[in-house]
Amino acid sequence: LVYDAVNKILNKNNILAPKLYTQRYDKNFIEIEDLGNETVFKILKKKGKNKLSYFNQIIKLLIQIQSIRNRKVKNFRNQNYTIPKYDKKILINEANLFCDWYVKNNLSKLRKKKFRKNFKKIIKKLTLKLKLKDNIFVHRDFHVSNLMSVKNQIGLIDSQDALIGNKAYDLASLIDDVRLKTVSYTHLTL
């Protein structure tokens, strides 16, 4: 269970993430720690909250995540797990999501097929030229709905897609979060 292994790495680095309490994986059952339902997103939507303090905590958490060096852990089956590297294959798969989600609903069937073929060719060509500098722990879903407020601390959920990747990935996820108008908050730190 990747989720548990990644959370163990986070916990070992003093980052609050749900712990696995019990599991019967063969019966499709796991019991994990409940971090509650107070997402940072809910807090930031409320009027009168000190939003700057939350953004400061989020940035400190991001720095802490990016400082993780030990990327190996034993999973609940006592097997070694190492966080994989973000590679060109993963990049191509993520680029293809554009076709799966956006193009699928916005082009005719004939245009979709032609677009998909051309898009894949262009993406493959671009990735051949790309030199990935992947050396940082990347959560890959680092946005305010996956950040939990727990007793004056920020916890992290939904970590199963973590990889070793580019340091800009999680920051871009946070800044470009469609649920939150971060532009209206950027003046707070300037």
Q: PLM ranges: what are they?
A:
Residues 81-125:
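Active-site catalytic-loop/activation-segment of kinase and kinase-like phosphoryl-transfer enzymes
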Residues 71-75, 104, 108, 184:
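Charged, solvent-exposed alpha-helical segments that act as regulatory interaction surfaces
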Residues 102-104, 174-177:
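Well-ordered alpha-helical scaffold segments within catalytic/enzyme domains
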Residues 32, 90, 115, 163-166:
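A generic short alpha-helical patch detector that favors 3-5-residue windows
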Residues 48-49, 172-174:
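Glycine-rich, phosphate-binding/catalytic loops in enzymes
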